[in-house]
């Protein structure tokens, strides 16, 4: 919310979205902010599905993942801000979607609310055997938010021409021993690709992505769930 403005394009009391940092107040010339004039979608959505997490999902799965109708897509951290949107976009585009999340409650949310085809609980003792079973026909796109041992296993299941999108590696961030992939020759055998993506590379297209995802929300095709905390 704008508290004070000397900018002719923004008025005091306007709500905006943009890159302001994790802080109480920011001073800006307005170039990186967009005014929110929307009485159909919540303002909070512009921090989530219509903000940076949503843009990451949109460009990651569509531009980098290059999904097409009939693809099998696996998404790690499927209940998270990015993964939840990735899987829903893949479903909109006609893909079979397998999510990976931690715990029964998250997996239930992924399948019942977000309508993924399957969700595997990585906390289960038989997780890797379940993963092998669900991926036995090959994986066309793996959207990776986790890295580590899971990424290494997913390399075994990729199809010819598969695309692996590296968005994050949350299993490795606080690890004393970084686990790198040893099954990387699968990329060679399957003529597959593994590429990192950074959402800022697509800044010029944010408006287009925001409009399309907003339409999906209004059509009931895309759901979001924001957790709001005070303080």
Across the structure, where does each feature detected by a protein language model lie?
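Short helix-loop-beta connector
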Residues: 11, 42-43, 66-72, 136-137
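N-terminal Rossmann-like NAD(P) cofactor-binding module of classical short-chain dehydrogenase/reductase
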Residues: 17, 74, 120, 140-143
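A structural motif shared across PLP-dependent enzymes of the aminotransferase-like
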Residues: 19-33, 205
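Glycine-rich phosphate-binding loop and adjacent beta-alpha segment
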Residues: 149-222
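Mid-domain Rossmann-like dinucleotide-binding core that forms the NAD(H)/NADP(H) cofactor-binding site
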Residues: 48-125
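Short SAM/SAH-binding signature in class I
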Residues: 137-144, 162-163
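Glycine-rich beta-strand-centered segment in the early N-terminal region that forms part
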Residues: 1-22
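Short amphipathic alpha-helix with an adjacent loop that forms part of the alpha/beta core around
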Residues: 126-136
């Amino acid at each position: 919310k704008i508290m004070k403005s000397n900018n002719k394009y923004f008025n005091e009391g306007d709500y905006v979205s943009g890159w302001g940092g994790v802080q109480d107040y920011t001073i800006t010339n307005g170039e990186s902010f967009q005014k929110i004039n929307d009485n159909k979608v919540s303002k909070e959505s512009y921090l989530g599905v219509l903000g940076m997490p949503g843009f990451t999902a949109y460009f990651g799965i569509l531009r980098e993942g290059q999904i097409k109708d009939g693809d099998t897509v696996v998404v790690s951290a499927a209940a998270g801000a990015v993964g939840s949107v990735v899987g829903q976009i893949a479903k909109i585009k006609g893909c079979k979607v397998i999510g990976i999340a931690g715990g029964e409650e998250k997996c239930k949310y992924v399948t019942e609310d977000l309508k993924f085809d399957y969700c595997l609980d990585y906390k289960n003792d038989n997780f890797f055997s379940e993963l092998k079973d669900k991926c036995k026909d090959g994986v066309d796109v793996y959207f990776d938010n986790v890295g580590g041992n899971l990424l290494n296993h997913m390399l075994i299941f990729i199809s010819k021409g598969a695309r692996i999108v590296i968005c994050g590696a949350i299993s490795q961030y606080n690890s004393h021993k970084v686990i790198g992939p040893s099954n990387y020759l699968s990329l060679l055998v399957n003529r597959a690709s593994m590429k990192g993506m950074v959402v800022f590379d697509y800044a010029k297209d944010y408006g287009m992505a925001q409009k399309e995802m907003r339409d999906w929300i209004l059509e009931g095709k895309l759901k979001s769930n924001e957790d709001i905390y005070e303080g």
